[in-house]
Curated annotation (Swiss-Prot):
The keyword Signal applies. Belongs to the plant self-incompatibility (S1) protein family. This is S-protein homolog 26. It is found in: Secreted. Residues 1-25 form the signal peptide. Pfam families: Self-incomp_S1. The keyword Signal applies. The gene is SPH26. The lineage of its organism: Eukaryota, Viridiplantae, Streptophyta, Embryophyta, Tracheophyta. It comes from Arabidopsis thaliana (Mouse-ear cress).
Length: 189
């Protein structure tokens, strides 16, 4: 039989292991990289934050990278980027759904490592100094919007078609019911 002392040590180790697992393995974090692909001597200033975390300002020299760990279960992260003379060009965007972001002269590019075998296959997302609603949206974002609109319109069409068919079926059955009632009435005379 296990002594009480050994049992308490075993329970303590088990509880400690569960606590460590809940802080590491069970809370999934993914990496977000922001890279400066601007021309020579054109630094990039990055300020990433969320409602609970402020990652302070970082200055990236050309070809430099900034790494951010984002917890999937936590709040929404977004980043401000500034570049150009006196850092007058600016853009802000959400980074929760992206693995690699590149700042280039014409705007911000995006790529997901798990889908892009070649890291040079980035998609243009946002232009500098352009509001997000006016900026060229990513093909991924437009696909999601168009697919959701298509899906919702198909669902609405399906319900409309079912409603029309049920109404036609009801009218057809109602006509048959009238004919049966008239036939019974005439037969009973």
């Amino acid at each position: 039989m296990i002594s009480m002392n050994r049992l308490s040590i075993l329970l303590f180790v088990f509880a400690f292991g569960l606590t460590m697992m809940s802080n590491t393995a069970l809370s999934y974090k993914h990496s977000v990289w922001i890279r400066n692909f601007l021309h020579e001597k054109n630094d990039l200033i990055i300020h990433c934050k969320s409602t609970n975390h402020d990652m302070v300002y970082h200055r990236l020299h050309p070809t430099g990278s900034y790494h951010l760990l984002v917890d999937d279960d936590s709040d929404y992260f977004w980043c401000h980027l500034w570049q150009g003379p006196n850092f007058k060009h600016h853009q802000v965007f959400g980074v929760n759904h992206g693995d690699v972001w590149e700042a280039r002269e014409d705007g911000i590019y995006f790529s997901q490592i798990k889908y892009a075998r070649d890291l040079r296959q980035h998609v243009f997302m946002y232009g500098w100094n352009v509001p997000l609603t006016l900026s060229r949206a990513s093909s991924l974002g437009l696909c999601c919007v168009s697919l959701s609109l298509l899906l919702s319109s198909l669902v609405l069409f399906y319900f409309y078609l079912v409603l029309v068919l049920k109404f036609i079926f009801f009218i057809m059955n109602f006509k048959n019911l009238i004919f049966i009632c008239v036939g019974i009435f005439l037969f009973s005379l």
